Amino acid sequence: MERERSHDVIVVGGGVVGLTTAVVLAENGVRVRVWNRDPAERTTSAVAGALWWPYRIEPEPLVGGWALESLAEYEELATRPEETGIRVVEGVHRGMSLDELGPWAARVPGLRTADDGEGLAALLPLIDMPVHLAWLRARLLKAGGTVEERVVTDLARVPAPVVVNCTGLGARELVPDPAVRPVRGQLVVVANPGVTTWFTSVDHSSDTSTYFFPQPGGLILGGTAEDDAWSLEPDPAVAAGIIARCAAVRPEIAGARVLAHRVGLRPARGAVRLERLPLPDGRALVHNYGHGGAGVTVAWGCAREAAALVGAAA
């Protein structure tokens, strides 16, 4: 017998946060539709690196819990990497120490000081985003949800008893919320010359950093974090700098064949907005946006909290 469906929800936004939220709702028995302006493969989520780690996201006391919930989910999904796009991979955060992290870090399995004493070593989920987004969509459809390409210009006109706003940077104009700002990230994808571990070295006082993530489709090199920059066009000089910084860590990267350039705009905000509000006609609006550079890192934790808010609104 088909599960009894409780009520209708439309999730606006089909990146990793929107799709994960929709999956949680659908598997809780909610009749859910995702409305997205662009297909998932053209969202910011699709161009992410994407390593599980709280990066450029606040508030830390809440982020830690959301991230750990997501970590547990990804560790289970990593048992089926070809299907889910998730693998657990070893790597090093250079220049980072345990005492600068929040209480959540004590619950990350295997997180330790690196052997050379110059950072933190860990086994962390590395997500192949195009594969993972396709898997989330398939899981949603299996649970009875639907995905539709729709352009939304007014959240109050979305025809559902509960509307969930997962529009990321789009919330700046749609809500409107001027606290949402773009942080431009540029990446270079190269043919992997044999790198099997990830690496990051991030200077939060600079708009450039150094990291590389081995993905099935190539080695992802980064990166940048340019506040209030809107351009989606790759900058050749920036790309050359990215390759040079990564090659200073692993010299074999210098001669690797370039496969692609990627640019994404992280939806930065002073704090994630995760709350329920009434619409003018009494229906409910649940906001779940502003995840900065850590949407995939907190996706499951935020999705479950958003689902609880939806349930409270029913």
Cite the ranges covered by each PLM segment:
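Glycine-rich FAD pyrophosphate-binding loop
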Residues: 27-46
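C-terminal catalytic lobe of FAD-dependent flavoproteins
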Residues: 135, 256-314
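Flavin-dependent oxidoreductases
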Residues: 20, 160-244, 249-257
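Flavin (FAD/FMN) cofactor-binding and adjacent substrate-gating region
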Residues: 72-144, 268-269
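Short beta-strand to alpha-helix junction loop
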Residues: 59-69, 119-135, 233-238, 297-298
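N-terminal Rossmann-like FAD-binding beta1-loop-alpha1 element of flavoenzymes
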Residues: 8-33
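A conserved short coil-to-beta-strand element within the FAD-binding core of flavoproteins
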Residues: 145-158
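Core beta-strand elements of the Rossmann-like FAD/NAD(P) dinucleotide-binding domain
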Residues: 5-7, 156-162
